[in-house]
Amino acid sequence: MEVTAHYIGGKPFVGDTGESFATLNPATGEVLAHIEQADERVLGHAIESAKLGFSVWSSMSAAERSRCLLKAAQLIRDHNDELAELEVRDTGKPIQEASVVDIATGADVIEYFAGLVNGLGGEQQSLGSNQFFYTRREPLGICAGIGAWNYPIQIAMWKAAPALAAGNAMIFKPSEETPLSALKLAELFTQAGVPDGVFNVVQGDYRVGQMLTAHPEIDKVSFTGESGTGKKVMADSAATLKPVTMELGGKSPLIIFDDADLDDAVSAAMVANFYTQGEVCTHGTRVYVQRAMYDAFVEQLKERTEKLIVGDPMNMETQIGSLISKSHLEKVLGAISSAKESGATLLTGGFQVTERGLEKGCFVAPTVFVDCRDEMPHVQNEIFGPVMSVLVFDDEDEVIARANNTQYGLAAGVFTQNLSKAHRVIHQLQAGICWINTWGNSPAEMPVGGYKLSGIGRENGQETLLHYTQTKSVFVELGAFDSPYA
């Protein structure tokens, strides 16, 4: 099988490094491609290419950059089905998700920042009749994007959009588990007229990430992944004082009060745990249900969860796809075993699905544990699989304290018909992304990011553009220079 490699300088690039790895379809075990592992020489070539691209791109007007990005977004939409199928084969997620969410929401963000950048300007202030100052928002230079495997192309677009809109170049490293869609994205950027070298893709494992974060000519790092790796990224970046944006792990609370709409609450809990087979950092895996609603909630949850369709991700009827890898499958099954050992009651699921031709994949039945306690390991630790923990609570103050008793702070949600209560509770929850009577919505206009160990900085929304620029202050003297020396 031919070795697929990198995308540097507006075209595919093979570095002849002598090392490669296989990327698999996790649903079937099929080898999709062999990918070249980048080395220092490949990264050096990418940086030189990015320098050239940056010199051209940053000198273009905001309107010119905007036109290129809008064209890229349209090309991405035109290739939606192709990109979605590629994403499904590489991730194992259902095609019904990828075809309507992953590609479209990435294109949304590119369009959003393409429109926003035209208004990116500085300020001017007079300091008297002969003096004034003004400021400029200037690009940082070369930004590194390090992606995750659960939403490969969406994450690539979420990182590239503000970086490129602000005039930067980017070197993007996809996860070695899902390396394919970023190459197609790079190709579409080139077709849209983005200058060569502005968006480059280098492939490889953690070693490539370490080279990027430590490199003195990388001016910023944006990372999506788990919190432990995020600490290492930040430490490596600190050596050259480069700014970082990090969207990390979570163990988010979903709080359901007894006046909530039962059907909506169950629907949200299912989406907040089983969408993308549970491999979403913002999932609400700690579901707190007020005692008066608990029994009815659990009864409906069991009935509806057992109707979910686990199957071939390429089948439009499939609702639960394959986990990303055999090693991750073992981790999730281990967490399920731990939950049983800790005394939680298995309501439904809890096993690997192997019938109907799924034996070669990494499928886990949607799993719900009840009678959970806050101190149980599966309640405290991020599992990143289709495993829900349901906990009962009695009053508002109690559930707020319990919901906040975690090292994470990525997301939180509240379901209640009392909007005063909803806002009162949300304002006390220690989380960066919050929802009221819904779960998971993430429009391009809304900044997203975490508190505590769930991240630093934000993605999307107006403030994100500021993370990809730096302020230059210019003081102007119109009169004679007033020297203190004779």
From Swiss-Prot:
Keywords associated with the record: Metal-binding, NAD, NADP, Oxidation, Oxidoreductase, Potassium
PANTHER family recorded: ALDEHYDE DEHYDROGENASE-RELATED
Binding positions for K(+) 1 per the UniProt entry: 23, 90
Gene that encodes it: betB
Protein name per Swiss-Prot or TrEMBL: Betaine aldehyde dehydrogenase
Enzyme class: oxidoreductase
Pathway: Amine and polyamine biosynthesis; betaine biosynthesis via choline pathway; betaine from betaine aldehyde: step 1/1
Annotated binding of K(+) 2, by residue: 241, 452, 455
